[in-house]
UniProtKB/Swiss-Prot annotation:
Subcellular location, record wording: Cell inner membrane
InterPro entries named in the record: Protohaem_IX_farnesylTrfase, UbiA_prenyltransferase, UbiA_prenylTrfase_CS, UbiA_sf
GO cellular component annotations of the record: plasma membrane
Gene name, Swiss-Prot/TrEMBL: cyoE
Source species taxonomy: Bacteria, Pseudomonadati, Pseudomonadota, Gammaproteobacteria, Alteromonadales
A molecular function (GO) term: protoheme IX farnesyltransferase activity
Known EC number: 2.5.1.141
Protein topology in the membrane: Multi-pass membrane protein
Similarity comment text for this entry: Belongs to the UbiA prenyltransferase family. Protoheme IX farnesyltransferase subfamily.
Native organism: Shewanella denitrificans (strain OS217 / ATCC BAA-1090 / DSM 15013)
Additional comment: Carbon 2 of the heme B porphyrin ring is defined according to the Fischer nomenclature.
UniProt key word Cell inner membrane: yes
Keyword terms: Cell inner membrane, Cell membrane, Heme biosynthesis, Membrane, Transferase, Transmembrane, Transmembrane helix
Protein name as it appears in the record: Protoheme IX farnesyltransferase
GO biological process, alphabetically ordered: heme O biosynthetic process
Pfam families the UniProt entry points to: UbiA
Length: 301
């Protein structure tokens, strides 16, 4: 008779801890962010991206983004425990202590900064550090609790990744990279406001002044619709300056029309769960938009 498989308690504990630390880095969010970093790198150069800034740049930026996410978990641990979307996170569940979580977040950020500073360039290291502070401190610790415009103002930190990718391979700021920042900056409010509509009661419960809580759902739906039009214009900027060609023009136009249509549905159709559908669509919108940017660069550029 086969003996039952017995996993030592210590091994199980290590496995669970590893998963908890990994969850704190918000891997799905970081993965989408790294796509925009990669596209920023590729668009900055006419040919192939050099291996060193590609590998160390992606790794260092990912580590600092994971650090920012972990600090977000730390700062929001009280309200996370009261919201259905986040109550199962490691800190509210007591799977990790505050000290361990802080040590992890701090160490990950320091290692990422050192990696970028020494093996990529100081400019990228400092810009990534500024993004970390912008998200973890300015947005999470202050803006999120202070104003319904938290997403609009704080969105700048989350819009930086393509610029970081650009500077990682060029060691300089460029106007074209800023256009990519503008696109993500404009995309952020309708993306998060759709989620905020879906989770309005939870945000109200923990006194977070998201726009649907302070100004109502209908006003927020109007803002989402208006922002999708603004985003459509922002998405045309790479074409207007000659940075991208017809492949991107067609692809981005289709995606923009899709987002506007979804926002129009949200505003004028009373369909349960539609806000969450808009939120999910916005993720695919950004992902596909940057893929189209990349395809256009190598086919047309």
């Amino acid at each position: 008779m086969a003996k039952p498989l017995i996993i030592p308690a210590q091994s199980m504990s290590f496995s669970l801890s590893w998963r908890d630390y990994f969850e704190m880095t918000k891997p799905k969010v970081v993965a989408l962010m790294l796509l925009t970093v990669l596209v920023g790198m590729c668009l900055a150069l006419p040919g192939a991206v050099p291996l060193q800034p590609l590998v160390f740049g992606m790794l260092g930026i990912a580590m600092m983004a994971g650090s920012a996410a972990a600090f977000n978990h730390l700062i929001d641990r009280r309200i996370d425990g009261l919201m259905a979307r986040t109550y199962n996170r490691p800190l509210p569940k007591g799977k990790l202590s505050v000290n361990k979580a802080f040590s992890f977040a701090f160490s990950l950020g320091v290692l990422g900064f050192v990696l970028l500073y020494w093996w990529v360039n100081p400019l990228t290291a400092w810009l990534t550090f500024a993004s970390l502070i912008g998200y973890a401190v300015v947005y999470t610790a202050y803006l999120k609790r202070a104003t319904p415009q938290n997403i609009v103002i704080g969105g700048l930190a989350g819009a930086m990744p393509p610029l970081l990718g650009w500077t990682a391979v060029t060691n300089e700021l460029h106007g074209n990279a800023l256009l990519l920042v503008i696109i993500i900056f404009t995309w952020t409010p309708p993306h998060f406001w759709a989620l905020a509509i879906h989770r309005k009661a939870e945000y109200a419960k923990v006194d977070i002044p998201m726009l649907p809580v302070t100004h109502g759902v209908e006003f927020t739906k109007t803002c989402i619709l208006l922002y999708t039009f603004l985003l459509a214009l922002a998405c045309l900027l790479p074409v207007l300056v000659g940075m991208s060609g017809p492949v991107y023009l067609v692809g981005s136009s289709i995606l923009s029309c899709g987002f506007i249509y979804k926002a129009w549905q949200l505003k004028y159709q009373d369909e349960p769960g539609l806000a969450m559908k808009v939120f999910k669509f916005s993720i695919y919108h950004l992902m596909l938009l940057f893929v189209v940017l990349l395809v256009d660069h190598y086919l047309w550029g």
